[in-house]
Amino acid sequence: MSADVILYNQGVQYADGNIVTHAATYPASGSWTTGDIVLEQTSTTRLSGWKRITTGSGNVLGTDWVYCSNLISGTAQATTSGTSITFTGIPSWAKRVTVNFKGVGTSGTSNKLIQVGNGAVVNTGYLGSQSVISTASAASGNTTTGFAIASGAAADRLGGAYVLTLENASTNTWVCQGVTSASNVGSSFVTSGSVSLGSALDRINITTVNGTDTFAAGEINIMWE
């Protein structure tokens, strides 16, 4: 029995044992195709639908029914000067954003702070806490202006990651959890919490609680999916 796949634009073609694809005229823009999978030799028994082959936005494959995307990396930014580091251009379809720290240090003792935004950085309404765990002791606190990292020493050089996940798309509520460590003091810094935005997240800002300590070492990058 033959098992051919036949592609063509108009009309109907049947052949014994074949899988027949029938394509109509495609739209003028974008890379599209459409087709019917004929289950048997009658024009009424078919599965119809548009299929998007490429989206032009770096996706491995996108369709009208299933959205597939590769993990997309931002551009790493050096954390060697300034009071804040901002990443913009996060697409509205992103459901998870990871903030990666490598040897990040600041000039003072104010806790580091991760903030999200939608057109502008949001600095209110955060719920959660931050903790430091060291070989000698443990301590915790909470901050409402962002997801705080309880590293309070200028000598600390933080490495690790914090993951933000979309918990509720209808309210644009994001949750955060993650940990970094400072090998110079044998401490780990654990952060968790949530925040609701008025619209889709499009940026991440990293600063300090007092807003005046400057970055002095390392780099930060983000990834989204």
What are these model-derived regions, one by one?
Residues 1-18, 54-69:
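Short, low-complexity N-terminal tether/leader segments at secretion or assembly junctions of large
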Residues 18-24, 29, 33-40, 51-54, ...:
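Surface-exposed molecular-recognition determinants
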